[in-house]
């Protein structure tokens, strides 16, 4: 199974991806995580350092693909998860999306794709141009990371549009949303009422998740020392369990931009209607109690 993880930049895709990869590994799956971002920090919490990228390796080999071996580009991370970083061109030069395509090409030539139960692509921000949408060409499922905010859900809607477009010619489905760093899900629920799709999990705002990124460790590794963190790992295990069952998924029908903008902004601009509804609900509850 191949899984492409997308979401607004800075939403926590890489941290979430690494923990999902470990969760899948703990369920007995052989996992490869491919970082598709020029920052090449997708697998940092799995390996504890910034591993050399595909581009770094090709440069050292003078771009002789035939001289590249799997061990040159695949690094072992925590929990037995194998890691690859695509890398990218120098800032302001070249096309990062092209590098993603070349990474997939190289791994296929190395027959690396055939050795894993699950391949997870952790993809740059919410950029879904042709190059960075390339992982969707190979993926069985797309997973969108979001929070309960306007910008992240607006980005999720654009990604949903890309999934729908790719699903015309590829066997691709949207597995669903994962809410991250949010204690509420009211805006998420408002969005999925408009654009129906599953919500696999909603993780609350947990400081240890942010700290794990700084430490270069997954929550599972931190939980080996601090048993109180086991409950956080359960969120990721729940996501893994749902993915392993190969859910039916959906081909989403995204909301037009202006309609979605109006829908989500109204949630912020008209809080009185929300408060009023809560008051009505409470009055109805009081009558029921009487």
From Swiss-Prot:
Keyword Transmembrane helix: no
Binding site residues for ATP: 10-15, 39, 180-181
GO cellular component term, pick one: chloroplast
EC number annotated for this UniProt entry: 1.3.7.7
Cofactor remark from the record: Binds 1 [4Fe-4S] cluster per dimer.
Reactions accelerated catalytically: chlorophyllide a + oxidized 2[4Fe-4S]-[ferredoxin] + 2 ADP + 2 phosphate = protochlorophyllide a + reduced 2[4Fe-4S]-[ferredoxin] + 2 ATP + 2 H2O
A Pfam family it matches: Fer4_NifH
Iron in keyword set: yes
Pathway: Porphyrin-containing compound metabolism; chlorophyll biosynthesis (light-independent)
Domain of life: Eukaryota
CDD domains the record matches: Bchl-like
Positions of Mg(2+) binding: 14
Job of this protein: Component of the dark-operative protochlorophyllide reductase (DPOR) that uses Mg-ATP and reduced ferredoxin to reduce ring D of protochlorophyllide (Pchlide) to form chlorophyllide a (Chlide). This reaction is light-independent. The L component serves as a unique electron donor to the NB-component of the complex, and binds Mg-ATP.
Quaternary state and interactors: Homodimer. Protochlorophyllide reductase is composed of three subunits; ChlL, ChlN and ChlB.
Family recorded in the similarity comment: Belongs to the NifH/BchL/ChlL family.
Protein name: Light-independent protochlorophyllide reductase iron-sulfur ATP-binding protein
Gene this protein is translated from: chlL
